[in-house]
Amino acid sequence: MGRRIRIQRKGAGGIFKSHNKHRKGASKLRPLDYAERHGYIKGLVKDIIHDPGRGAPLAIIAFRDPYKYKTVKTTVVAAEGMHTGQFIHCGAKAQIQIGNIVPVGTLPEGTTICNVENKSGDRGVIARASGNYATVIAHNPDTKKTRIRLPSGAKKVVQSVNRAMIGLVAGGGRTDKPLLKAGRSYHKYKAKRNSWPRVRGVAMNPVEHPHGGGNHQHIGHPSTVRRDASAGKKVGLIAARRTGRIRGGKPVKFTKEENV
């Protein structure tokens, strides 16, 4: 019997632990409350810090508690142009400026936003990687929904009351600098997750992987597998409709006027 392959070890009940020892905290907007729904609340950017395992910097914002005499600190992914000592306004009546957190329904079309809520009150899940942003496309006042363009280019409809931070996420251009050597990849993934180095299946022995073995590195059989294959066999091109290079382009159909 062969050994458990990588995809089986990654499944439920895995032995791996999250690399979160030195992380500074989760990136979340402040909890939605009465002050944000009907007005705004002011906060102060205390510090902008590096969070290991995250490409974007984190901003530590101190808000005054609306009900008790104390301050509450939250960690949020920093927007490009945010600085220490800056006042951040959160709420439906906040001004439109970089770093403020407002409902997407109050923003004009074409506004660049980040840290967008998918559901009202989830404290921001969309467009949070370094340099990422979403764009407000259109509003529908009748259904109280807003259409936004995601960083992938896909369009998405969200509730107009969902909050977002104005601006794009700081740390853009991080991936433009090449890693150049294996040591940098080692430290990068040591802070992120246990996914490096990744050994190819054809470089393994036949006991360790369906693609392993042979006097030279080759798969030795078609790499396509059926959809309902067992977990230890389900590697390669899974339920592929077609394989190989896509040769040629899409045929162009001309109208009668263009043929003339």
Curated annotation (Swiss-Prot):
Keyword Cytoplasm among UniProt keywords: yes
GO biological process terms, semicolon-separated: cytoplasmic translation
Ranges for region Disordered: 208-230
rRNA-binding keyword on record: yes
Domain of life: Eukaryota
InterPro entries: NA-bd_OB-fold, Rib_uL2_dom2, Ribosomal_uL2, Ribosomal_uL2_arc_euk, Ribosomal_uL2_C, Ribosomal_uL2_CS, Ribosomal_uL2_dom3, Ribosomal_uL2_RNA-bd_dom
Major site of localization recorded for this protein: cytoplasm
Family: Belongs to the universal ribosomal protein uL2 family.
Protein name as annotated: Large ribosomal subunit protein uL2
Gene: rpl-8
